[in-house]
Amino acid sequence: MKALRIILAGIILYGISNNSYSQTTDIQDATIYKTELFGSAATGSNTPFWMVSNRYGIVPQEAGNGLLNAGVFHNQHFGKGFRWGAGLDIVAAVPRYRNVFIQQAYAEIGYKSLLLSVGSKERYNSLWDRNLSSGDMVQSTNARPIPEVNLSMPEFTLVPLTKGWLQVRGDFAMGRSFDTDYLKDFANSKQVYIKNVLWHHKSFFFQIKDTENDFPLSLTVGVQHYAQWGGTSTDPKIGKQPQSFKDMIRVICGQKGGSDATLSDQINVLGSHYGSYDFKLSYTEKDWGAHIYYQHYFNDKSGMEFANKTDGLWGLQFDLPFLPWLNKVVAEYLVTMNQSGPMHFILFDRDKWQGGRGGGNDDYYNNGEYTTGFSYFNRGIGSPLIPSPEYNTDGSLGFKNNRVKSWHFAAEGDINTQLSYRVLFTAMNGWGTSYFPFLNKKFGTSSLVDINYTHPKLQGWKFSGSVAADTGTMLGKSVGFSLGVTKTGILKAW
């Protein structure tokens, strides 16, 4: 029976892959290069928040920094419906623990709408606007990419026999952390953490949209799941975590750990898990569009069953291409205050809260065994509005401020054909965690103004400048500016 289900799933996947809604032939057959020179200065000890956040982890947090980024990327179609690609991207940055590092190194092969990728690659899987959103709660652009094997359907693809009304996309990946040396340098001597962590994530989205007659209303619904597992603890008494093939299946399916797992993982599920339900309703006309969305975040089964009420990211976006100077506007509200209640009482009421389900104090992005939390190189993988462990000045690990209420506003537009801008403003409130609340609420604002300039006689060149500021007690006070130059071009067209 299981084999039959696998065969049927394969047939359905093959059928869908041959009905691409966003054609892969749009990918340019070429070998391209990209170089970027960036530098910033600030009055505080840290670079202003929005100069650092959602940059795939390449901009150093410390004030007075600079970086050089150089990459080569190849895409080429071959045969009937096949394509392959590869990329190498190297960053040199100061000040930083390691001044030169590989940001991206991957190879991939695709058929129709399917893509198999191996290595570290900057991806964007979120439904929210890439330039203006504060960030996806499960997989944002805030941290460096984790090396992984990723099988995906990256673009929405038509489902057969639905008359163009139903499209799907998703991915499935297994990866591994390579930040052990960094954590050893950052963490104080009292910190216990798991090194060489293994990762799993998957997502599935379906979209109800009229692709034939342009009916303006559409609905997108999705689910995302991320998990940390395996690895070896720096505490010899804890040692190596379960990481057999059977354990991998347990992590994928969200099941309890075996007899070799910790007591907590035997009671709940193996590893540390994070996820979300994503909802987006869109109304799109030829010259304008409106989108309303909600991302319901969860750490365990209680959150999956909405015991954490309305926690998550709420958003509104307007697309305004008919306006001369304003193209898009985004407003978001992030709230993580409920967390299924203030106390984790799973051990006190076993009849009500069965194994595999948490019972309060979900402690978003944190975990008892995986003390680094939902981060890579100490940058949060999810929303940057829950401040990353990199902001911990005492060498401690984990997220110290995950009970937040934040408002975020953003806009972008074109002043003329050569000059564009982006504006971000965020007001943040933080109360610490349920176990370790702040004595006084922390508050702060972060703002950014980006200006980008291109010239028709300087093909492939982009010049950028930014001014940013942080205020209040949340992140500290800092005012800064940055300058950047980017050059892209084609080495060879195929």
Give the ranges of each region predicted by the language model.
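Internal, well-ordered domain-core segments that constitute the primary functional module
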Residues: 123-235
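Exposed, low-structure sequence patches enriched in small/polar residues
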Residues: 215-227, 231-494
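Short loop/turn motifs that connect adjacent beta-strands in outer-membrane beta-barrel proteins
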Residues: 23-33, 74-85, 97, 110-114, ...
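Sequence/structural signature of outer-membrane beta-barrel proteins
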Residues: 42-44, 89-95, 121-137, 158, ...
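Bacterial Sec-dependent N-terminal signal peptides
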Residues: 1-27, 489-494
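Transmembrane beta-strand segments of Gram-negative outer membrane beta-barrel proteins
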Residues: 23-68, 78-88, 168-174, 463
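Extracytoplasmic loops and strand-loop junctions of Gram-negative outer membrane beta-barrel proteins
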Residues: 52-56, 89, 132-135, 185-190, ...
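Surface-exposed loop and membrane-interface regions of Gram-negative outer-membrane beta-barrel proteins
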Residues: 79-111, 123-142
